[in-house]
């Protein structure tokens, strides 16, 4: 049972224990009872209950039948080497030893010099080989062999990959090795074999890590290498926090580290703040170093993740590639997204392939072509967009679905005092400052001891030179070297070293000039000793020296920041945040093509002109609907089958007037033969708002607007239809609003919306109007409650005040009739005659106008008429005469060969009329002059 319990113990718990420390885990594991195992002679195990506490232990079975026979075959010698040990204890200790070996010896960097052992060994081996920045390159294979043979007894591929990475400018913010040859690329191309590539130390390595000063005895500790044949440094005396300068990453047992690189100039500045004020707040440090600085540049979005990483050691830094928008075709307004920088550790070729795959899968829309034009001058990935595609939307989708936006998960774990520890920014900086103080103190003590020793010798030489004749006489009077040394010591009170140095002086140094040099040297040594003593006794001087050395590096090697930090509250940018909420025109055709254009596409024209074409229409296609909305609006698409779909207005590609539009089947999940008959823009799904729906056969119903706030991509049912009927008109309304209905024969019913009971989506509704044979519904419009004072009974008093009902016949004739000319009538009635039409003519649309008035009390609205051939005319409503219910009306648009009026829409007037472009001017010149007096034909 103990054996199985030990084997079932999870490895992380076995490693760390309930308290989270290695020592606690070892103590907890040692208290467990487990099996006794004999190794390595055990081949089979059996259980017995011979232990005193009744627990079952595992004992070895004898290989033979007789123990004596086994002993006769050498079993006794083997048995002497069998060491009984508890299985759980051996497993725990062995696993902990392995884990700590990986943690301390391979995977994690030291917080003091910021290097892993393999990096440190490579750099030290290259320095021993004399591969300075001004020396010739040497083969990488030779460096790898040197490292493997002397310091790092592991695989050659691991050493070579580390060497290659230290030479890649897209992996290291400040490369430590200069590479000559193929050292890989940002496209993850592998480097050439080590027998082909060459390397040497980079000039920055000597200054950042102060590797030249490593031979100053006592500055850092040296430890034996793996075979005790020589020694290697346990640390390099780094002058700047190399852990933050180039960052680090590694995976160990039970933990990992991932530290981003930073800018040298900012790092020195933040080090200065930390030295001058150890109690500085994190915000003060962020003012000097706002965040990481990645070698590949890009943009860092937001600083919340940076703040968390610097505070706790863990955080998520969101990165984006650097992009530009270029126009590739001015005439067609086609543009392209140019990727100039990618996020750190992003494979460019994989990114390009992924974008192409998403375009094929139709996850990314609006992209027509993608190609990589990168060369030695820099990165350039061109993403060409389709005509009418919004670059901001496409770019936002690229951020959302590809590695063009990725995150760097900071996990700042490093070795501190022989143990792995998660540290924040202040703790890392403080650990480096303490280490650097120790290095400077040890260096100063070493130099002090050398200066004192040299001064002692120089003082003895000066004494000898001052008594040169006596010295010569003593030397000549002795028979050997030892007697001369003893005589000098006895005569002048010299030490052994002083006497030995005096005896070693050559004759040419006995001149007076040489004596002066020794005197000056003694004086210089005295000053140096004084400075070193002062340095060792004053901590502030040590801090000043640390800062001075770091500042020298900043002045010599600092470069501008590559990664731009963009302030943002959220890294998830919604399309609405980047798209301006502008007024737009949506044009829907009968065959299911939709276009989005700016309102100024159609300039104001006079009543009675031909108009301007809405654009190129496909064969046998006509304009079905024409609305005005905002780009942020939800657009509800109602089909003839009573199904409603939803999409934002900006999802429709913006196009020119001459474009044919975008098929709705590319935007909506329409079934075969399904047509969109009405589109309704919604900016907010209010609880007191409703949608009124009207079918061709005259059925009407009211549904709460919020019933359509969540529409799935496949659509939902909006109304139940009888066979042969279809949904045609949908409008927004409130309870107190009026709804005006008109049939093709000109019959009108005006009633309040509160007379309609709110129904669910899956209902048919009630009959709105009794239609005569051959008659169908022609239009529906809503009159806001704040804009009407309509009496409930008919008044014979002629009142021409607004609002008015604007009637538009399909032959291009229209009129305005005061709303007061109608009385409120119930639904399911024949209605009142609103427009008496000739036999070959029918009513095309009815609008309620007069909501926006000028100073003189006239309408400030405009109406856009669209013919079956696609011709559009935009005119002022005030130019349309006010007539009685029985009058024929005036000419609004001369159709000629344009067919009949297909649809009409009201838009708000601009504050200033825009000047007509040459094209519209030519169209107007072809039209007949507007009549000075409106022709009216009485009924």
From Swiss-Prot:
Residue ranges with Basic and acidic residues bias: 930-939
Keywords assigned: ATP-binding, Chloroplast, DNA-binding, Isomerase, Mitochondrion, Nucleotide-binding, Nucleus, Plastid, Topoisomerase, Transit peptide
Compositionally biased residues, Low complexity: 46-57
Principal subcellular localisation of the protein: plastid
Active site positions: 196
Reaction(s) the record says it catalyses: ATP-dependent breakage, passage and rejoining of double-stranded DNA
Subcellular localization(s) per the UniProt record: Plastid, Chloroplast; Mitochondrion; Nucleus
Coiled coil feature spans: none
One record GO biological process: DNA topological change
Motif (GyrA-box): 605-611
InterPro entries attached to this UniProt entry: GyrA, GyrA/parC_rep, Gyrase/topoIV_suA_C, Topo_IIA-like_dom_sf, Topo_IIA_A/C_ab, Topo_IIA_A_a_sf, Topo_IIA_dom_A, Type_II_DNA_Topoisomerases
GO cellular component, one term: mitochondrion
Keyword Cell membrane: no
Top-level taxonomic group: Eukaryota
Disordered, as annotated region: 46-73, 906-939
Topo IIA-type catalytic domain segment(s): 108-578
Gene3D superfamilies reported in the protein's UniProt record: 3.30.1360.40, DNA gyrase/topoisomerase IV, subunit A, C-terminal (2.120.10.90), Topoisomerase II, domain 5 (3.90.199.10), Topoisomerase, domain 3 (1.10.268.10)
GO molecular function, one term: DNA binding
EC number annotated for this UniProt entry: 5.6.2.2
SMART domains reported for this sequence: TOP4c (SM00434)
Function text: A type II topoisomerase that negatively supercoils closed circular double-stranded DNA in an ATP-dependent manner.
Subunit note: Made up of two chains. The A chain is responsible for DNA breakage and rejoining; the B chain catalyzes ATP hydrolysis.
PANTHER family registered for this protein in UniProt: DNA GYRASE SUBUNIT A, CHLOROPLASTIC_MITOCHONDRIAL, DNA GYRASE/TOPOISOMERASE SUBUNIT A
NCBIfam families linked to this entry: gyrA (TIGR01063), PRK05560.1 (NF004043), PRK05561.1 (NF004044)
Family the UniProt entry places it in: Belongs to the type II topoisomerase GyrA/ParC subunit family.
Protein name listed in UniProt: Probable DNA gyrase subunit A, chloroplastic/mitochondrial
């Amino acid at each position: 049972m103990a054996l199985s319990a030990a084997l079932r113990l999870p490895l992380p718990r076995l490693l760390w224990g309930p308290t989270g420390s290695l020592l606690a885990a070892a103590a907890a594991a040692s208290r467990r009872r487990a099996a006794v195992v004999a190794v390595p002679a055990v081949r089979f195990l059996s259980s017995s209950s011979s232990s005193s506490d009744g627990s079952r232990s595992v004992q070895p079975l004898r290989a033979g039948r007789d123990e004596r026979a086994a002993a006769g075959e050498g079993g006794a010698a083997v048995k002497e080497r069998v060491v009984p040990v508890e299985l759980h204890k051996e497993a725990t200790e062995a696993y902990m030893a392995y884990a700590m070996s990986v943690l301390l010896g391979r995977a994690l960097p030291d917080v003091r010099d910021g290097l892993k052992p393999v990096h440190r060994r490579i750099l030290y081996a290259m320095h021993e080989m004399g591969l300075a920045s001004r020396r010739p390159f040497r083969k990488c294979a030779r460096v790898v062999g040197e490292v493997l043979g002397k310091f790092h007894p592991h695989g050659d591929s691991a050493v070579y990959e580390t060497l290659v990475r230290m030479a890649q400018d897209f992996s290291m913010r400040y490369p430590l090795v200069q590479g000559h040859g193929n050292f890989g690329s940002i496209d993850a191309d592998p480097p050439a074999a080590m027998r082909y590539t060459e390397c040497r130390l980079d000039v920055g390595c000597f200054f950042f890590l102060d590797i030249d000063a490593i031979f100053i005895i006592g500055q850092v500790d040296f430890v034996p290498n793996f075979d005790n044949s020589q020694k290697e440094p346990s640390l390099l005396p780094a002058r700047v926090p190399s852990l933050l300068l180039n960052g680090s990453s590694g995976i160990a047992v039970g933990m990992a580290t991932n530290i981003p690189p930073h800018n040298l100039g900012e790092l020195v500045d933040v080090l200065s703040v930390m030295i001058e004020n150890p109690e500085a707040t994190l915000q003060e440090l962020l003012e000097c170093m706002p965040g990481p600085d990645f070698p590949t540049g890009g943009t860092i979005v937001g600083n919340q993740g940076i703040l968390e990483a610097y505070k706790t050691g863990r955080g998520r830094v969101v990165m984006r590639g650097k992009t530009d928008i270029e126009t590739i075709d001015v005439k067609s307004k086609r543009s392209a997204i140019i990727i100039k920088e990618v996020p750190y550790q992003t494979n460019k070729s994989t990114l390009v392939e992924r974008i192409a795959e998403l375009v094929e899968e139709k996850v990314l829309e609006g992209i027509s072509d993608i190609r990589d034009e990168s060369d030695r001058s820099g990165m350039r990935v061109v993403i060409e967009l389709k005509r009418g595609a919004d670059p901001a939307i496409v770019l936002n989708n690229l951020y959302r679905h590809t590695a063009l936006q990725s995150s760097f998960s900071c996990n700042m774990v490093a070795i501190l005092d022989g143990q792995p520890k998660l540290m924040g920014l202040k703790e890392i900086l403080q650990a480096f400052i303490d280490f650097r103080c120790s290095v400077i103190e040890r260096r100063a003590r070493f130099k002090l001891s050398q200066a004192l020793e040299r001064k002692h010798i120089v003082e003895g030489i000066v004494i000898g030179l001052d008594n040169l004749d006596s010295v010569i006489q003593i030397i000549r009077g002795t028979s050997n070297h030892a007697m001369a040394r003893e005589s000098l010591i006895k005569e002048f009170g010299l030490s052994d070293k002083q006497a030995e140095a005096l005896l070693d002086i050559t004759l040419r140094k006995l001149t007076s000039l040489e004596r002066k040099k020794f005197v000056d040297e003694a004086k210089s040594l005295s000053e140096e000793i004084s400075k070193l003593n002062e340095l060792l006794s004053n901590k502030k001087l040590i801090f000043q020296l640390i800062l001075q050395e770091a500042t020298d590096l900043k002045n010599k090697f600092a470069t501008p920041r590559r990664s731009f930090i963009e302030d943002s509250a959220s890294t998830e940018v919604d399309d609405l945040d980047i798209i301006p909420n502008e007024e737009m025109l949506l044009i829907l055709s009968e065959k299911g093509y939709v276009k989005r254009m700016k309102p100024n596409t159609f300039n104001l024209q006079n009543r009675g002109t031909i108009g301007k074409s809405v654009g190129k229409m496909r064969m046998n296609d006509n304009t079905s609907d024409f609305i005005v909305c905002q780009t942020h609006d939800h657009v509800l698409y109602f089909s003839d089958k009573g199904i409603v779909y939803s999409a934002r207005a900006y999802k429709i590609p913006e196009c020119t007037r001459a474009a044919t539009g975008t098929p709705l089947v590319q935007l909506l999940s329409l079934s075969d033969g399904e047509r969109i008959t009405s589109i309704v823009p919604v900016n907010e799904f209010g609880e007191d708002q409703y949608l009124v729906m009207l079918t061709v056969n005259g059925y009407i119903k009211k549904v709460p607007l919020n019933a359509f706030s969540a529409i799935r991509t496949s659509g939902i049912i909006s109304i139940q239809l009888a066979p042969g009927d279809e949904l045609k008109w949908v409008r927004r309304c409130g309870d107190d609003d009026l709804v005006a209905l008109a049939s093709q024969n000109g019959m009108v019913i005006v009633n309040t919306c509160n007379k309609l009971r709110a129904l669910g989506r899956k209902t048919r509704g009630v009959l709105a109007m009794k239609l005569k044979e051959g008659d169908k519904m022609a239009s529906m419009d809503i009159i806001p409650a704040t804009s009407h004072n309509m009496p409930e009974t008919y008044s014979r008093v002629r009142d021409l005040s607004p609002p008015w009902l604007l009637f538009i016949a399909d032959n291009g004739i229209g009129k305005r009739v005061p709303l007061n000319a109608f009385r409120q009538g119930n639904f399911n009635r024949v209605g009142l005659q609103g427009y008496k039409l000739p036999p070959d003519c029918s009513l095309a649309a009815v609008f309620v106008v007069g909501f926006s008035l000028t100073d003189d009390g006239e309408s400030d609205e405009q109406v856009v008429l669209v013919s079956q051939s696609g011709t559009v005319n935009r005119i002022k409503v005030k130019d349309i005469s006010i007539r009685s219910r029985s009058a024929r009306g005036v000419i609004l648009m001369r159709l000629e060969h344009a067919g009949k009026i297909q649809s009409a829409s009201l838009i708000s007037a601009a504050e200033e009329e825009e000047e007509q472009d040459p094209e519209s001017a030519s169209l107007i010149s072809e039209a007949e002059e507007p009549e000075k007096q409106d022709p009216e034909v009485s009924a």
